[in-house]
Amino acid sequence: MKKIFIKIARLFGYEIIDQNNFVSPSLNKELNDDLSIINERSIVLPLGNVDITKKVRSLLIILRMNTEVEIWDQKKKRLFEQPKIEYSIRSINSLIKSIKLCKNKYSHLSINTVVIDDNSKKENLDKIKDLIQNENFEIISLDHEKYKSIIKKQKSAETFSNLASLLQSFEIGKNQGDDLIFFIEDDYIHYETMLEEMISSYERIASQLKKDLIMCPSDYPYLYMNNEKTNILIGSKRHWRTINKTLCTFMLSKDLLNKYWENLYKTCIDRHDPFEKYINEIYLSEVCISPLKSLSLHLTNINSSYGLSPFIDYKKIWETNK
């Protein structure tokens, strides 16, 4: 009789909760397990389930890498004060771990990664190639010449290269992206669960809102320096908050990239104040969210308002991604 009742309940879209034994008989799981059904339902206790209508099919990751410049446009040193190549290695290593964990859960999901390299010396580039040799990564060189007639003359070669690599990453997203596109910089170290949580939370929240959204993986300190109102949303495993500013690490859909191509393009034609001026304009019309707490750590100077997320064990995440 119990089995028949469970089948009938599931037929009508319900799951059974046995709070006495702390299990779900219909899902055959304990209640502190992941109760969600991939691409079908996102289940968070005690809020029930969300039917997934925004299903993620593929993810294109585009990582901008510069293993030589310590901190662009600054003379300050990063946390731990190591050569820049050490940050690039740890960033990519953490990304590889996150991709593998995500693929274990979302085996149907196509994940491809393109690395845009900006003039790394051979010694550094060889280290990166060794790191990714068995992964679905492609390294391409930044085409400086292509953008000399497009980007306005800048005060420094570093600024020009930064704008050029950003424009090349946006163009690759436009030409090669199919579903979700994730723009990443090589001074972020990611938690292993980062991608899996971003995908599952994207599906849940976008399905609830019935629209595409933009996600930033980092909980920046500057988000707490102004008395700005925000909305708190429930993701798959943590809270997310609405934000109206990001840096250049964010994930969005191909449809949103096409819709706001002019904003992305104008960001790269000249240096603006703030740098992300035209990107931030997008968030006046679209929902952008970041996690509470952070899924990725921006390793800048310890005093930077654009860097270290609060309540993170910085040394642990650094040491575990050598």
Which positions does each model-derived feature cover?
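C-terminal catalytic/acceptor-binding lobe
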Residues: I243, K254-K322
